[in-house]
Amino acid sequence: NAMLRMQQQVERLVDNRKKREAKGAVSSQAGTLGRVSLVTANKPRQMLQLINQPGEAPGSHAAPATHNQEDAVRMALQDAALGDAARAPQSATRKALTRRESLAALERLYHLVLQLEQLRREPSTPESTAAQKQLTEALWKELRVLEPLGVSDPHPFVSLLNHVKGKKLIPRVFRLLSAEQALAMLTMLIASFESLDAVKEFAQWEKYRVLDPMRHVRPPISAHQATDLGRSIDAFSNSVLFQMMALINTLSLRIISGMLALLMERNHVLACARTRPGISLLSALLSRAEALRQAANAPPAADELEQWYSVLGVLFNRLSSDGQLPSLFYSTRAASYMPFGVDMFSLGTVPGHAPDSNAEDEPVWNFMALLAIHANLSQQQVLVQELREKILSNILAAKEAKASSLPMPPGAEDVRIRNVNLLLHALNLDAAQITL
């Protein structure tokens, strides 16, 4: 499971970061969750005392906006040398591929892939090598990756991926392409991310899942449409996104900075982050950057790190502006979908009804931990301040569930605590230190 491996990688990154910190250093988040010092023999761990200051507005410790944000993004795009995807998109010059045209192109692609796979299984000869080269060129042309951005809406390559057949073909195609072609495909996927149906239609599918179990509430789409969308989102996550994450784990920090800058330049990054695929992509980029930053054998150059932090500052400001960080959580969005007077949490406890909000929120807590690892002190203060209510409500719900007399599966009451600790451990805090 890709997301499970991502969570384990984040936990390793957090542990490695803690080991590097000097002993006796003080870690605190004053004015939000309280103050905590590292434990010593003479100064044992103290329980955090939460002080709710009524006059303090959320986000009052917000970090200042990154200076020259557009310049930081533009420089990252130039240094990464991402080709045509980094240029301004042209206006649409032709109609998008129809469903019939897309399916016909996919049939040709499948035929080319089968031929190439057969040639690779046979002993290599000069004739087979020449045939492979010719077929690979035809495959690359048929994919239409290099067609200019904005040539149609959606892009021809995106039109192919808006079919489940197209998504399932991507892993086989990646194995047949050169490293440069694979990078170009990744660049196009990131540049066109929000136009992919698995991202563009995600909110409608999510809203259907929340509202469908309820009587007298009409979901935004039909059951048939929801089934098709769910199949498409699963295919994208298991095929396309899996290959994207695998390729991201081979890139340098300069390219990672460029990819993140490209995602923000060509897409509404906050809208993307409110989707499961968007959170997975952002987590993969931040996880790779932190792994490179911690690399002992070949650490990134100082200018690469400076550029990374500049681009990351732009991302943080766009995600945290106007107190929008909580909206990245499924549980927050699900509450906004509910009609007035309906208790979504009690609905979610009924088997077979709305999705488990704790399981849906887990990848977001994972991303918040990565964000905290990269953030400076002022950004960490904003992060904790904006998520304060989310943190406390999870801890309170976990304690109430533990004290309840209702039978629960073993360890079920710890899911919320585990989610919260993904973030708190990155800040050298722990849910056990918080008293309510």
Q: What do these predicted regions represent?
A:
Residues M6-L436:
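Charge-patterned, phosphorylation-rich low-complexity C-terminal interaction regions
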Residues N1-A2:
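Compositionally biased, intrinsically disordered low-complexity regions enriched for acidic
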